[in-house]
């Protein structure tokens, strides 16, 4: 679960991390009241969306007075911001965060993520902070410095000093950086985060370090023990289909193709999308029905896939390990009848009771194309998508 910047900075403040004063508005009428809470004669105005790249997309601006602030709010509130991290529709802007400014001398990058290979938290720091950190990682990886944090002990002061030294900070700034490092480490572990990012972490002309931006992602599996964080979730930032899928424990991610995919298992789902691309098709989604697929969940999966008007064919790829293929076959038939599917459905079953499942499909009166292999299923789906441009059976 992602947090907005203003929510992340509230957490930063709670953990003693240096941030500038800021306030959020949800309507143009609130702009004057919000700015009255802040000092200075100019402010940073930031669209609040769950995506990076806001600055390059025009979603961050330095406003010089109240009128310019109101104009920025009028332009963006209720609109959608498209960045390189969003789809072509972008994400809705429901809040604008206004923040006091500071005189920047240098910009740094600081983040922490879970490294599953080492089973530790990895802190990453770089002297090249700002909007182009992705290019830094690709073109000059030697500018990225890392330390591993044991989750049993948390961050240790010497590790913060080690990073500060590599960033070229002075002794006074070294102490500030170490305090920030320790605070982020406590925040990361105590709140079960999967990502925390400060980009940029700035050094002001007065010699102080300030977290000028903040990004936080919380591990969804830990939300049950963080009710305070769960209450901060902004469902408007989620794709409506993804939000609906969560209700039925379906893992769904919308894409921009025309071949709807329903698969059990995340790895098999990714492999299915790869082979669809290999055969010249375009997957419309990632959808993992999980190991405990039932008739009801299969039906809901069909409904969610078909809410995408661009879907011209549905490819069902099931490997029966935990789940039985005969139950999946019955679920597919029931779903097609219940939902009234009007696009071709291609089904590939393998594993437990696969032959029984294929027989059930063959003996049904539902127009379903069955395949003996994933390659055959993919070819059928790609060809059907090309032929079925109007979305109806031929």
Swiss-Prot record:
One of its GO terms (cellular component) is succinate-CoA ligase complex. Substrate binds at residues 264, 321-323. It is an enzyme of class 6 (ligase). It holds the Pfam family ATP-grasp_2. Mg(2+) binds at residues 199, 213. InterPro entries: ATP-grasp_succ-CoA_synth-type, ATP_grasp_subdomain_1, Succ-CoA_synthase_bsu_CS, SUCC_ACL_C, Succ_CoA_ligase-like_bsu, Succinyl-CoA_synth-like. GO terms for biological process: succinyl-CoA metabolic process; tricarboxylic acid cycle. GO terms for molecular function: ATP binding; magnesium ion binding; succinate-CoA ligase (ADP-forming) activity; succinate-CoA ligase (GDP-forming) activity. This is Succinate--CoA ligase [ADP-forming] subunit beta. It comes from Haemophilus influenzae (strain PittGG).
């Amino acid at each position: 679960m992602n947090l907005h910047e203003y929510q992340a900075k509230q957490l930063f403040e709670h953990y003693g991390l240096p941030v500038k004063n800021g306030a959020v508005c949800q309507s143009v009428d609130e702009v004057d009241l919000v700015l009255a809470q802040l000092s200075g004669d100019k402010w940073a105005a930031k669209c609040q969306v769950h995506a990076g790249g806001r600055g390059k997309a025009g979603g961050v601006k330095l406003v010089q007075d109240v009128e310019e602030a109101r104009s920025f709010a009028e332009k963006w509130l209720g609109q959608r911001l498209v960045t390189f991290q969003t789809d072509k529709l972008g994400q809705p802007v429901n809040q604008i965060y206004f923040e006091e400014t500071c005189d920047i001398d240098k910009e740094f990058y600081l983040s922490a993520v879970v490294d599953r290979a080492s089973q530790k938290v990895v802190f990453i720091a770089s002297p090249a902070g700002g909007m182009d950190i992705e290019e830094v990682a690709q073109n000059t990886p030697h500018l990225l410095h890392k330390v591993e944090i044991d989750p049993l002990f948390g961050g240790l002061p010497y590790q913060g000093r080690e990073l500060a030294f590599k960033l070229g900070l002075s002794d006074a700034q070294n102490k500030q950086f170490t305090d920030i490092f320790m605070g982020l480490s406590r925040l990361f572990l105590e709140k079960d985060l999967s990502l925390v990012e400060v980009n940029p972490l700035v050094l002001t002309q007065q010699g102080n370090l300030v977290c000028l931006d903040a990004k936080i992602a919380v591990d969804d599996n830990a939300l049950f023990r963080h009710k305070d964080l769960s209450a901060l979730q902004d469902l408007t930032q989620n794709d409506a289909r993804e939000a609906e899928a969560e209700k039925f424990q379906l893992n769904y991610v919308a894409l921009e193709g025309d071949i709807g995919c329903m698969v059990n298992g995340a790895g098999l789902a990714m492999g299915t999308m790869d082979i669809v691309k290999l055969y010249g098709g375009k997957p419309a989604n990632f959808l993992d029905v999980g190991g405990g697929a039932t008739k009801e969940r299969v039906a809901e999966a069909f409904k969610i896939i078909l809410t995408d008007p661009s879907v011209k064919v549905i490819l069902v790829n099931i490997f029966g390990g935990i789940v039985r293929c005969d139950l999946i076959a019955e679920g597919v038939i029931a779903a097609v009848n219940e939902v009234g599917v009007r696009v071709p459905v291609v089904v590939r079953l393998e594993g437990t009771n696969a032959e029984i499942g294929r027989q059930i499909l063959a003996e049904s009166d539902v127009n379903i194309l069955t395949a003996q292999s994933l390659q055959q299923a993919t070819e059928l789906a790609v060809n059907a998508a090309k032929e079925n441009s109007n979305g109806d059976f031929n």
